[in-house]
């Protein structure tokens, strides 16, 4: 006699574990709390333009961000940076694409055209939000993340921690 819970038997768990496949899968949406760290490889940025403004400058660049933790992969980050020295702020907006895995999922690609990061130039406090909601490839998933700066690595690249929720439309596969 074979026993299973929600269609998952002990034998299927063992086979999936040997194959390195996540065991949990369902047809219902699955919410997953995620956390990890990242590094903005700012030292290797391609600066496309710099424009002086009365209060600072506006830069457009392309950068790569490395993510570790439950989101594991790279982000191609096309960013517009507005530096306002009167307000003492640096604000990043633009478009970014994440390519990688989420909690061991199959590879995904997700776009975010609504991210927002803000740095207080006086204190160095760095906070932001990420909205990886536009599916490009892989499992249907979307992630909403909060980001907090943690300083710089030995090369001077900004580092950060992220937390949030990823929702897989049809379970994690």
Specify the residue positions occupied by each region the protein language model found.
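Beta-strand-enriched cores of mature, soluble protein domains
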Residues: 24-173
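Bacterial N-terminal signal peptides
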Residues: 11-21
């Amino acid at each position: 006699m074979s026993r299973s819970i929600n269609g998952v038997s002990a034998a299927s768990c063992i086979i999936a574990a040997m194959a390195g496949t996540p065991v949990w899968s369902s047809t219902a949406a699955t919410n997953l709390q995620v956390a990890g760290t990242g590094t903005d490889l700012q030292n290797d940025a391609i600066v496309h333009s710099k424009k002086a403004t009365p209060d600072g400058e506006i830069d457009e660049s392309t950068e790569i961000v490395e993510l570790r933790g439950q989101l594991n992969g790279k982000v191609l980050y096309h960013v517009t940076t507005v530096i306002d020295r009167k307000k003492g702020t640096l604000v990043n907006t633009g478009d970014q694409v994440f390519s990688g895995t989420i909690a061991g999922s199959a590879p995904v690609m997700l776009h975010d055209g609504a991210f927002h990061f803000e740095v207080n130039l006086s204190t160095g406090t760095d906070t932001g939000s990420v909205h990886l909601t536009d599916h490009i490839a892989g499992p249907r998933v979307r992630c909403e993340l909060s980001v907090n700066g943690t300083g710089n690595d030995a090369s001077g690249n900004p580092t950060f921690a992220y937390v949030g929720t990823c929702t897989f439309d049809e379970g994690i596969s």
